């Protein structure tokens, strides 16, 4: 039970460390369609981040119970699932 208290913070540090390497960009310049479980405010990197996001070309987020979003990147880099960076919810 005690190991669970330390697992989440160490995972979060790994994600934030990866996100910190993103260069500053315009908000809508590199926006791509993604599906996320939730979009939440973030202190660093500034803006909003998406939780449990994946690239979505079919735009069927509602079918899986996720939120249709637009994010600049997903970290860690090179994967299809992860934390969305600089996200916004699509209407």
UniProtKB/Swiss-Prot annotation:
Its main location: secreted. It is found in: Secreted; Secreted, Cell wall. Residues 1-17 form the signal peptide. Expressed in conidia. Keywords: Cell wall, Disulfide bond, Secreted, Signal. Coiled coil: none annotated. Disulfide bonds join 31-70, 35-61, 36-53, 71-87. Belongs to the fungal hydrophobin family. Self-assembles to form functional amyloid fibrils called rodlets. Self-assembly into fibrillar rodlets occurs spontaneously at hydrophobic:hydrophilic interfaces and the rodlets further associate laterally to form amphipathic monolayers. Aerial growth, conidiation, and dispersal of filamentous fungi in the environment rely upon a capability of their secreting small amphipathic proteins called hydrophobins (HPBs) with low sequence identity. Class I can self-assemble into an outermost layer of rodlet bundles on aerial cell surfaces, conferring cellular hydrophobicity that supports fungal growth, development and dispersal; whereas Class II form highly ordered films at water-air interfaces through intermolecular interactions but contribute nothing to the rodlet structure. This is Class I hydrophobin 3. It comes from Metarhizium acridum (strain CQMa 102).
């Amino acid at each position: 039970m005690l190991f669970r208290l330390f697992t989440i913070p160490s995972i979060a540090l790994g994600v934030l460390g990866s996100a910190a390497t993103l260069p500053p960009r315009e908000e809508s310049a590199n926006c791509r369609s993604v599906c996320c479980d939730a979009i939440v405010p973030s202190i660093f990197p500034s803006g909003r981040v998406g939780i449990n996001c994946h690239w979505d070309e079919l735009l069927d987020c509602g079918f899986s119970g996720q939120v249709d979003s637009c994010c600049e990147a997903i970290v860690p880099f090179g994967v299809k699932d992860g934390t969305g960076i600089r996200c916004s919810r699509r209407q």
